[in-house]
UniProtKB/Swiss-Prot annotation:
Catalysed conversion reaction: Exolytic cleavage of the (1->4)-beta-glycosidic linkage between N-acetylmuramic acid (MurNAc) and N-acetylglucosamine (GlcNAc) residues in peptidoglycan, from either the reducing or the non-reducing ends of the peptidoglycan chains, with concomitant formation of a 1,6-anhydrobond in the MurNAc residue
Keywords for this protein: Cell outer membrane, Cell wall biogenesis/degradation, Lyase, Membrane, Signal
Entry's Gene Ontology BP terms: cell wall macromolecule catabolic process; cell wall organization; peptidoglycan catabolic process
Molecular function in Gene Ontology: peptidoglycan lytic transglycosylase activity
Its membrane topology: Peripheral membrane protein
Residues annotated as the enzyme's active site: 314
Protein name: Membrane-bound lytic murein transglycosylase F
SUPFAM superfamilies: Lysozyme-like (SSF53955), Periplasmic binding protein-like II (SSF53850)
Enzyme Commission (EC) number: 4.2.2.n1
Region of interest (Non-LT domain), residue spans: 31-269
Protein species of origin: Salmonella arizonae (strain ATCC BAA-731 / CDC346-86 / RSK2980)
Cysteine pairings via disulfide bonds: none
Coiled-coil regions listed in the entry: none
Amino acid sequence: MKKLKINYLFIGILTLLLAAALWPSIPWFGKTENHVAAIQARGVLRVSTIDSPLTYAVVNGKKYGLDYELAQQFANYLGVKLKITVRQNISQLFDDLDNGNADLLAAGLVYDSARVKKYQPGPMYYSVSQQLVYRVGQYRPRSLATVTENQLTIAPGHVVVNDLQRLKETKFPDLSWKVDDKKGSTTLLEDVINGKLDYTIADSVAISLFQRVHPELAVALDVTDEQPVTWFSRLDDDNTLSAALLDFFNSINEDGSLARIEEKYLGHGDDFDYVDTRSFLRAVDNVLPELEALFKKYAKEIDWRLLAAISYQESHWDPQATSPTGVRGLMMLTKNTAQSLGLTDRTDAEQSISGGARYLEDMMAKVPETVPEDERIWFALAAYNMGYAHMLDARALTVKTKGNPDSWTDVKQRLPLLSQKPYYSKLTYGYARGHEAYAYVENIRKYQISLVGYLQEKEKQEAEAMKLAQDYPAASPEELNKAPFPFISFLSQSSGYLTHSPSLLFTPQKKEEK
């Protein structure tokens, strides 16, 4: 899979071009008959999106998503409320613009020459490639030359259809595919995972997130190069909304808000490891149930699933784990640390988890208050791994190299330098295995994503099974004699539960959220 690339130079050039085009519309607050004025008069910014872990999702009643958070900030910027409408596929999104039911589309949509003829793009803020996926264990196509419509299905409105058409005309005359008008990209990915479909095409970020919960999903080949992602609005003579978007994105880029949100949703990396992910999910099924209550009991300052992910990174949930340097137990505590925490047995699961949680809380309390709340945990984890003093060195080095010491994105890039003599020789606390601390934090983030998604998926499956049981409750022999059991209906409804359903990070939401 291609490395995700956030090209700020490219974004800057496009933003300048957009600014030149929109210059007559700025300042936009002064106009009365314009899109921004209409939104402010209504008091609501209407945004249409699709349900995905990157764009918009509701988990345990809380809303998440890169596009959701940006849309909420933009609504605040305009001084209005945000109204999110979730659609099934991309075609329905553009229908909302055409029918006047949405002001903006914020759904990880790719900038495309065909789209910009009909719709107004906004600033570009990250990029993806389109990739063809298949299920591990099935035939992997090495080229599009032999792919047929019986194998490849695309969601309606998908930008890749234009690319496929060009490839068919120029390179692969036998290439064919079909479009399923009733399914979105998320559902088609599920179909590939469940063996109902040979291939589909999705963007690289969506695929990497799916793989954290479904390691059996594999990338066969890249269909496109990197493509910038943007929001879309209606294309007409009034550019006030586009001008407002430009001003908004410039402001969050300058104050670091954009980088923090991108780090939150895109910073987990894309170096997917099938074997490691599969082993982790097996441990979730077989080992975690014995430890779950302890993680929940002692995770006071953080989500218990994050504490569990830390423990897996430390010991693979082995209470007897011991390293060559002498650290031991589920949280791999040193003897000195254990003594300072009042622990008597590092291999005791409860003592280790309680001690590790308290030690992490101490690290979080030491993180400077200037660090944003949602990034403090990553600084604390780096300190947990390599020591608080070396984390201070990493911040100091970030300042010396013109970075922001309060930005995890900037600081983590300097961590590997702590093991290089030209850098550590000039730092207060000297040499540190900064590259290990970098990998440590990144691995924990990946395990956390997998754990959250996998557990939510299991909860969904249990809820669906309970509903099925309620629809078809157990009957007495006398009742069975009165009427035959509706096997056909039962099988048709239960077939979807025989394999893994999608993660709740990908669970379809209500059609409209206010």
